[in-house]
Amino acid sequence: YKDSSWEIRGQEIGYVFYSSLCYHLFGSNFNIYLLFTNFLLIVLFYKSLKYNEIRTGLLFILFFFAARLYLQYNFILLRQSIAMTIVWVWAFPFLLKEEKIKFCFFICLAAVFHYTALIALLALVMNRNLNIKYIIIAICFFFVLSITKVVDKILLLVIERCLSVLGSSEGIGEKLSKYLLESEDGEFRGLNLLTFIEAVPFIYIVREYKSILFSSFIGRFYTNMFYIFILLLAITMNFGFLTRMCQYFIFSYFFLFSFFIKNAKSIAERRTMLFLFSNYLLIYSVRYIFIWFYSTEYSFFLFKL
């Protein structure tokens, strides 16, 4: 890629190779490229549910995926979407089988498409008997620090030191700043309450059905993943890029919801949860469309429906 532009050189080699292959297969029509890629990713996402023993409530989980992740990740953050899919469909299932070498291989493969996949290596500790009380305390602690902006200063200091030690170029520093400081006035993104509101139903599930979840290896694995995911969100909630980096662990939501649909104590409880969460997802998806399309020529069409 000697003659490639700066933007292409800044992409991971796996994504560049895949895009180049699609270019030779389909030509320069970007819509066909998106159609093929997203069809492939949706099929693999469905496979990932099966491979992770998620067999109940599949239609609702697909609705969850479409409303919560599809518009953003499968179009705007396509590289990370590919990496997330690789982690979900191959890496996590191999870890559940305790095949750690294969797990690490697929994490590295995912990182070739988007380097944030390396954070999924944290899953290596999620199959252990973690002390959930300490994790909850850590969540509360970092939540307070994030609200008071203390975590912001610490993370920026660490990043600056790391870049200094690595001798990174100014271009990388500018790109990183663009990811971290997302508002127009150069401030941190700030707290997104929806991130934590959507976690409330799952907090109920892991607390109410704790004994059943921890009675199986896979239940303990995804319960631990959920708590660590919330901890990471509490740490990174003021940094949009870092928050998105943690989304590999949102897969725990899919498992927990499928588990709940299957094990709900009553039909009324199941229906109430489905009603509340369905309405939340509808509001979330409409809000997201509003944010991204309101100022474009498509806004009239979208909101006229």
Language-model region placement:
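Alpha-helical transmembrane segments and terminal signal-anchor/GPI-anchor hydrophobic tails
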Residues: 16, 123-245, 292-305
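Transmembrane-helix motifs of polytopic, lipid-linked glycan transferases
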Residues: 36-52
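Short acidic/glycine- and proline-prone juxtamembrane loop motifs at membrane-interface regions
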Residues: 74-81
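Signature aromatic-anchored transmembrane alpha helix within multi-pass, membrane-resident enzymes
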Residues: 139-140, 265-287
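Membrane-interface alpha helices of multi-pass inner-membrane proteins
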Residues: 102-126, 230
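Transmembrane-helix signature of polytopic, membrane-embedded enzymes
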Residues: 49-66
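Short hydrophobic/aromatic helix or loop-helix immediately within or flanking a transmembrane segment
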Residues: 2-28
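Membrane-interface transmembrane helices that cradle and orient dolichyl/undecaprenyl
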Residues: 84-102
